[in-house]
Design a protein with these regions (language model features):
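Short, surface-exposed ligand-recognition loops at beta-strand->loop->(often short) alpha-helix junctions
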Residues: 12-21
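Short, well-ordered beta-strand segments in beta-rich or mixed alpha/beta enzyme
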Residues: 5-12, 40-70
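Short, flexible segments with low predicted structural confidence
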Residues: 3-5, 20, 37-38
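An amphipathic, aromatic/His-enriched active-site/gating alpha helix that lines ligand/cofactor pockets
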Residues: 27, 33-39, 58-94
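Glycine-rich beta-strand-turn "strand-cap" elements at beta-sheet edges
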Residues: 1-5, 42-51, 80-107
Length: 107
């Protein structure tokens, strides 16, 4: 698969589950990084709402393939089942169309 996708995920956590949400997500990210079509991910915490985690992900696959293949991986099952308890509202997933990358030149 030669198509690259990027997307942003917002995970608005419940304050009482902030640490559990983060640790559960980190376990998934460790496994996710081993996937052959994984490119990168950046995990952030919202400044405006510290209970919200935000991911920026890039994959070498189509959005449809990502949603049907990666969201159902066995290492995600416990995490996916826990999300309704950990989140104050449903997560959002916004797909982006990569246009161009800008990187700092090597010194």
């Amino acid at each position: 698969m030669s198509e690259n996708i990027a997307f942003i995920v917002h995970l608005p956590g419940k304050p009482e589950h902030r640490d559990e949400l983060e640790s559960s997500l980190l376990e998934v990210l460790e496994q996710m990084a081993k996937e052959p079509d994984f490119v990168n991910t950046y995990l952030h915490r919202s400044v405006e709402d510290p209970d919200t985690l935000v991911l920026y992900e890039t994959w070498a696959c189509s959005p449809a393939y990502f949603q049907t293949h990666h969201l159902s991986r066995p290492y995600r099952q416990v995490y996916e089942q826990a999300l309704p308890r950990l989140l104050k509202r449903e997560r959002t997933l916004e797909f982006l169309k990569p246009l161009r990358a800008f990187e700092k030149p090597a010194a």
